[in-house]
Amino acid sequence: MQLSDFDFDLPERLIATRPARPRTAARLLLAEGDRIEDRHVRDLVGIFRPGDRLVLNNTRVIPARLTGTRTRGEAEARIEVTLMEPAAAGGWRAMAKPLRKLKPGETIRFSDALSAEVAEKGETDLRLVFDRAGAAFDAALADAGAMPLPPYIAARRAPDAQDDEDYQTVFARHAGAVAAPTASLHFDRPLLEALAARGVGFTEVTLHVGAGTFLPVKVEDVTTHRMHAEWGEVTEAAAAEIAATKAAGGRVIPVGTTALRLIESAAASGAIRPWRGETDIFIYPGYRFRVTDALMTNFHLPKSTLLMLVSALMGQERIRAIYDHAVRHDYRFFSYGDASLLIPGG
C-alpha cells in the first residue's frame, strides 16, 4: 500500500481560513453506501435516527502559540514557540523558530508573567520548563498565548481574537489539546438540543490532540508508518453508554477522527472498555472496525493518515469518488472547512 495511493489534487482556493457562520451553516456531504447528497450541518436533525449515539471529544485547546524574546548579552532574538505536549521529564515539548538561535540553559521571556528555560534541545524540537505551574501557568498562558492554528491556515494569516471562539468546540471541558477536534466545531447548542430532542444520545470522551496530527507521512510503504502518541480517556460511564447503544442495535457515530481513534483503542479487545493512557493507533485500509458504525469528519489533506483512516472505513475507491465530488462541488477543506458524514454500506 503506497503513499501515492492517497494523493489527490486540491485547488488552494478550497482551503478554508475561516469557518462558516453560523457553525451549522457549513455544508455536509452525506455519503451512505453508493449515494452522495449535498446537505448542510443543520440538516443532521433529519439525518440521524433516534437511538444513534454521537461520540464527542471534549478536549479543550490551549493557547499554545507563544512569541517571546531570548536575550544573550546585549543581543536579542525573537522566538516563536508552539507547545506540542507535556514532556515525560517535566515541562513541555515544543517547536521553536528559529530553533538554531537557542541553546540549553537559555531563557525565553514571553511576558512579564511567563518565562521558560530551554532544558533540552533536539534536532527538530526542544523541552521547555516554565517558571509557573498549575493554575498560575494556565492563567499566564491564557494572557500570553494565541490559538495554535494549523500550518495551512497560519501560513495564510495570523491568529486573532476571533479564533479563540472559532477554534474551540462548544463542549470543550478538559484543557490539553494543541489542535482542535475540528468536526465538532460545526455543532452549536441549538443543534445539540434539537438532536437530543430527536432521541440521539451523546457520549463524551477525551483525547488531547497533539501537534503530531499535522506531521506528514515520510515513508512510501504506509504500513511501516508509526503514529505519534496522544493521551486519552474513555470513562467507565462512557464505555457503558457505547456498549448499551451497540446492544440495542443503535449506531455509534464518532464526531471526528480523534473520537474514532480513541474508542477503537478502547475496543482493541473486541468490546468497548474503560480506557486511559496514550494511543498511537494507526488506522488504514484493512483495519477491522470494532465499535464505529459511521463517522462525521471534515475533509483531510492528501497523503495524510486521516485520509487513510476514512479510506479504511469507506474503501479507497469510494473515498476517491467522495473527494472528487467534494472538489468538483467546491466544498471547503481542512480544519475550518465543511463536513462529511460517512456511512458504510447502505
UniProtKB/Swiss-Prot annotation:
Pathway: tRNA modification; tRNA-queuosine biosynthesis
Any one GO molecular function term: S-adenosylmethionine:tRNA ribosyltransferase-isomerase activity
Keyword Cytoplasm in annotation: yes
One Pfam short name: Queuosine_synth
InterPro entries per record: QueA (IPR003699), QueA_dom1 (IPR042118), QueA_dom2 (IPR042119), QueA_sf (IPR036100)
Compartments reported by the entry: Cytoplasm
GO cellular component, one term: cytoplasm
Name by which UniProt lists this protein: S-adenosylmethionine:tRNA ribosyltransferase-isomerase
Organism: Cereibacter sphaeroides (strain KD131 / KCTC 12085) (Rhodobacter sphaeroides)
